[in-house]
């Protein structure tokens, strides 16, 4: 389907009978309209050709071989525009055989049939709109009971029989016995309604705006009543209010999409294109057919039987007609969703038939396996591992995957640089893994983004673009900040990598899909690139420190050994009695850590700017140390003040660790970079 902006899209919803017939009908030169499948046959057992008006009819679905009709005549497609496009004898159109992948047919049902998705799936849309119990509607659909039509001021059979109830449970055993087929049909059309036709009438009589108004009034009345004091009654009222909300939302959706509720009852049943339900000949001359073909045959057999009962048979009891309508309803239910809330239908080998729902739903369905998860060229797959040294917009590709994905680009580069005279020599250089191959691969990857996808792709952040870099190993390296968008972790998850080929795809990847341009959740607007899992553990370990305060050196001999026999430049830091290091800048502390003179979690004193905010006004020093020159140090829980003889503050030291310093510097650099970028943008 193509919308007004020329975008290809797929829309799933209910359609009108007119739209179904428009999809299938074709007008032949003699004025005959074809498109309706009336016979349950597939191929003739002698000629091995599709049966006319059957499930594989060439008049309805197109020729099996391009440009060849059922008679065997051949015509070049599009060569002679003046000649008729249809064969005059068999009525087959001269067209490409690929039309059998999308040309549909239809079955004209002899009675209305309820779509099982809207009736039996929970929540039931039909039950919600009609505000009736699902069990009652199922009994009505499967002809277990009926309801009387309101006919005012007219004598009716039901009045004569004294049956004035709205729902008549006893019709199945009494009323049909009085009529033949035509008589019962007349009686039913005039006085009672049953089957899917009754559902269709009630849906057609609905005014959705009145449904919304009545539901809203009832919801407000229930809300004004308040609590009854009975827990069971309160729960019942709560469930009723939830139901009314769902009913209003459903009615609004029908109004917004301009869909008529009676479309949930089928009069025409679409028939899938033959290529989507093939019959394949295997070794030994045996045929292997899709289960959907057998289910379609079952529907056509029962529908044709019902048609014959309604048209030709004049003495058949009305009860038999009702039973046949029930069989048609069950056959269509099995075709659309086999076994929904019941026992599934099985073949002779006790194997469950795969219905239309089974074909499209689930991990192995048409959408997830064939359309979304199918194998494509220029793609690869591997396990993901954390890449902490990567930028947010980069990903690490293993050499083995990268050379396969970009092989055609590398071959073109080798030929352009006159390093290979033809494709064969270029491929041999790639197989031998010559150094020049990796250089050209690096150049190609610098200007070509890749797409990473993690199944299931439930929202748009399931596919993001990255700038690839070569890494060793066989796993894809990923920045941990992008894991939340993919719903990925590093416990064995796999991701697929794709190469956008066209210029439009590359432009879309760069402008819309790069990971650093998708920092907010499209659903709620919250930041989605937040530290999770490995990053949180790393930040915890980095800033864990030692929680024993200033007494750590005095009572932990293991830490004291870290400083024994260490000679340190007095310009960088000096020792106290407990050998607790003093640093005059964060650079000195990080340098000492890189030289392995201190460990990551070792408490240290870092000189801080004279900021009075770090000093608690009511805090009492834990210890005061006096120097020989009259200066002294006031030691608190997390900071230290050096005062002069006149009690003036000379300097302040804060208690920290190398891990805290590293974390603080990373945040500071990030904030400064953001401020610079913001100032440039404004």
Swiss-Prot record:
Gene Ontology terms describing biological process: DNA-templated transcription
Enzyme class: transferase
InterPro entries referenced in this protein's UniProt entry, alphabetically: DNA-dir_RpoC_beta_prime, RNA_pol_asu, RNA_pol_N, RNA_pol_Rpb1_1, RNA_pol_Rpb1_3, RNA_pol_Rpb1_3_sf, RNA_pol_Rpb1_clamp_domain, RNApol_RpoC1
Subcellular localization(s) per the UniProt record: Plastid, Chloroplast
PANTHER family tied to this protein: DNA-DIRECTED RNA POLYMERASE, DNA-DIRECTED RNA POLYMERASE SUBUNIT BETA
Protein purpose: DNA-dependent RNA polymerase catalyzes the transcription of DNA into RNA using the four ribonucleoside triphosphates as substrates.
Protein name, per record: DNA-directed RNA polymerase subunit beta'
Organism: Acorus gramineus
């Amino acid at each position: 389907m193509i919308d007004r902006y020329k975008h290809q899209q797929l829309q799933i919803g209910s359609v009108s009978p007119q739209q179904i017939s428009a999809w299938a009908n074709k007008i032949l030169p003699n004025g005959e309209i074809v498109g309706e499948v009336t016979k349950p046959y597939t191929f003739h057992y002698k000629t091995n050709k599709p049966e006319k008006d059957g499930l594989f009819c060439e008049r309805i679905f197109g020729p099996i071989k391009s440009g060849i009709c059922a008679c065997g005549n051949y015509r070049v497609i599009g060569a002679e525009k003046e000649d008729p496009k249809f064969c005059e004898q068999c009525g087959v159109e001269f067209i490409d055989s690929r039309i059998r992948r999308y040309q549909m047919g239809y079955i004209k049902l002899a009675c209305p049939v309820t779509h099982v998705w809207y009736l039996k799936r929970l929540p039931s849309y039909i039950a919600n709109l009609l505000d009736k119990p699902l069990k009652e509607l199922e009994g009505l659909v499967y002809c277990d009971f009926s309801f009387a039509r309101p006919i005012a001021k007219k004598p009716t059979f039901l009045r004569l029989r004294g049956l004035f109830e709205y729902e008549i449970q006893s019709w199945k055993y009494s009323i049909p016995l009085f009529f033949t087929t035509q008589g019962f049909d007349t009686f039913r059309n005039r006085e009672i309604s049953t089957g899917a036709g009754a559902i269709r009438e009630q849906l057609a009589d609905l005014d959705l705006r009145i449904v919304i108004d009545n539901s809203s009034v009832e919801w407000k009345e229930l809300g004004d009543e308040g609590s009854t004091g009975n827990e069971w009654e309160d729960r019942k009222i709560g469930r009723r209010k939830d139901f009314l909300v769902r009913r209003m939302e459903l009615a609004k959706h029908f109004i917004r999409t301009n869909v008529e509720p009676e479309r949930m009852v089928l009069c025409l049943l679409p028939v899938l294109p033959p290529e989507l339900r093939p019959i394949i000949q295997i070794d030994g001359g045996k045929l292997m057919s899709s289960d959907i073909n057998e289910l379609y045959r079952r529907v056509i057999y029962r529908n044709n039987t019902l048609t014959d009962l309604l048209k030709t048979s004049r003495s058949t009891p009305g009860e038999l007609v009702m039973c046949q309508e029930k069989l048609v309803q069950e056959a269509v239910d099995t075709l659309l969703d086999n076994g929904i809330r019941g026992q599934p239908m099985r073949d002779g080998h006790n194997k469950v038939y795969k219905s239309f729902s089974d074909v499209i739903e689930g991990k192995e369905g048409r959408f997830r396996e064939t359309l979304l998860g199918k194998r494509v060229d220029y793609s690869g797959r591997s396990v993901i591992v954390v890449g902490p040294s990567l930028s947010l917009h980069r990903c690490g590709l293993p050499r083995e995957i990268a050379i396969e994905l970009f092989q055609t680009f590398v071959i073109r580069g080798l030929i352009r640089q006159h390093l290979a005279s033809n494709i064969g020599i270029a491929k041999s250089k790639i197989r031998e893994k010559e150094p020049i191959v990796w250089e050209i691969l690096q150049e190609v990857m610098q200007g070509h983004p890749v797409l990473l996808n993690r199944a299931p792709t439930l929202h748009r952040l399931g596919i993001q673009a990255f700038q690839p870099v070569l890494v060793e190993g066989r796993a894809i390296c990923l920045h941990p900040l992008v894991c939340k968008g993919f719903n990925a972790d590093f416990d064995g998850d796999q991701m697929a990598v794709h190469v956008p080929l066209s210029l439009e795809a590359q432009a879309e990847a760069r402008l819309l899909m790069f990971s650093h341009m998708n920092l907010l959740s499209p659903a709620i607007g919250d930041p989605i690139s937040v530290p999770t899992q490995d990053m949180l553990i790393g930040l915890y370990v980095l800033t864990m420190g030692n929680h024993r305060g200033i007494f750590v050196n005095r009572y932990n001999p293991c830490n004291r050994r870290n400083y024994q026999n260490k000679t340190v430049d007095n310009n960088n830091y000096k020792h106290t009695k407990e050998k607790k290091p003093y640093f005059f800048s964060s650079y000195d502390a990080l340098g000492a850590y890189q030289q392995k003179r201190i460990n990551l979690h070792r408490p240290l004193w870092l000189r801080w700017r004279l900021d009075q905010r770090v000093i608690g006004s009511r805090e009492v020093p834990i210890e005061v140390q006096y120097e020989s020159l009259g200066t002294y140090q006031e030691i608190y829980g997390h900071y230290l003040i050096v005062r002069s003889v006149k009690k003036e503050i000379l300097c302040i030291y804060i208690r920290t660790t190398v891990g805290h310093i590293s974390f603080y510097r990373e945040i500071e650099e990030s904030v400064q970079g953001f401020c610079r970028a913001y100032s440039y943008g404004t």
